[in-house]
A protein has these predicted regions:
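A short loop-to-beta-strand structural motif that recurs across blades of beta-propeller domains
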Residues: 63-65, 101-103, 153-156, 194-196, ...
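Bacterial N-terminal signal peptides
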Residues: 5-17
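Asp-box/WD-like beta-propeller blade repeats and closely related beta-sheet repeat scaffolds
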Residues: 109-146, 162
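Blade-level signature of beta-propeller repeat domains, shared across WD40, Kelch, NHL, RCC1
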Residues: 271-321
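A short helix->beta-strand "capping" segment at the edge of beta-propeller domains
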Residues: 23-39, 68-69, 210-211, 304
């Protein structure tokens, strides 16, 4: 009980620091990515360390997007259903979570094949954000697409071709990230307005002892995607909050906010040769009726800290020679 009280006090102190307006000092300049491609709902950015390109998705546009910083151009790959996220695989293909299942996509000939479908997947949900752990397991969650308010979604783990339901009672599964040493997993179910930190068993891929690490203050927007930096600090995109934010997951303290000229900020990823460039995805969200000419575009900045190399999916089934 004492530990809980102390943790709550530290977390509250972190929120006071955020609300005191001390987090926008020396904010880096934010600019648009080269070709200015627009996504209805840009999401799931991840830097492919093999090809030195950024992979991301346009959910409503049914597209996987590949942005090359060298040329400033973006290649478009259409997929048959709404993609929630994409991650590169060790075999050179991409793992793409579509509405109705998890697929492997081959860039060379633009072919797609189904890898796994959870037994409990229904038409009332679709796959959303996801990432791989340091051992190459793919973690991905679903979202309630009927009211975006009911806890009917779940979080899954894909190992090889075997998919396992890990958490239930989820509403809008979003950001997932691991501490640099892989012993903690950070997870966001957006309506809860918090980041939960789980002790993580790297050998088995099991979660235990989840604790509230970060609470997003009212009026800041809702927590969406997240990523970790080389110092172990967690970055959280603020949907409806015009910003991305950097937090200390041990204290709950907000360290920095980077403002953007669009309301619906969805996710961010570190990339570039030195992993010192941040790529930030946004949503056009036409239904919102906002006058934002740059909404849905990809933004870039140099936040002053480096990221970590992305974990690739391991397609080999456990126990397979």
């Amino acid at each position: 009980m004492l530990r809980i009280m102390i943790s709550s006090l530290i977390l509250a102190m972190g929120l006071v620091f955020c609300q005191a307006g001390q987090v926008d000092a020396s904010a880096p300049a934010v600019s648009l990515f080269g070709d200015g491609i627009v996504a209805e709902t840009g999401e799931g950015p991840i830097w492919d360390p093999v090809t030195s390109r950024l992979l991301w998705v346009d959910i409503e546009g049914h597209r996987v997007l590949v942005s090359d910083p060298e040329s400033g151009n973006t290649e478009v790959h259409e997929v048959p259903a709404a993609p929630g996220t994409v991650v590169p695989s060790k075999d050179g293909e991409w793992i793409v979570a579509l509405k109705d299942g998890i697929y492997s996509y081959r860039e060379a000939d633009r072919t797609i094949r189904k890898v796994a479908v959870p037994d409990d997947l229904t038409d009332a949900v679709r796959f959303n954000d996801g990432k791989c752990d340091p051992r190459g397991r793919f973690w991905v969650g679903t979202v309630d697409t009927v009211r975006y308010a009911d806890p009917i979604a779940a979080l899954y783990r894909l190992e090889g071709s075997a998919v396992t339901r890990v958490l239930g009672g989820v509403t809008i599964s979003n950001g997932i990230a691991w501490a640099p040493d892989g012993t903690r997993m950070y997870y966001i179910d957006t309506p809860t307005r918090k980041v939960v930190a789980y002790d993580y068993n790297l050998e088995t891929g099991e979660l235990c002892k989840g604790v509230d690490a970060i609470l997003i203050p009212e009026g800041w927007g809702d927590p969406d995607g997240c990523t970790i930096d080389s110092e172990g600090m967690l970055w959280v995109a603020l949907w409806g909050g015009y910003a991305v934010s950097r937090w200390n997951p041990e204290t709950g303290e907000c360290l920095q906010r980077i403002s953007l000229p669009v309301k619906h900020v969805t996710a961010m990823a570190f990339g570039g040769d030195d992993l010192d460039t941040m790529f930030i995805t946004t949503a056009k969200a036409s239904w919102a009726g906002l006058d934002e000419p740059d909404a849905g575009k990809l933004f870039v900045c140099r936040p002053g800290v480096k990221g970590l190399k992305a974990h690739l999916f391991d397609p080999v089934d456990k126990g397979t020679p």
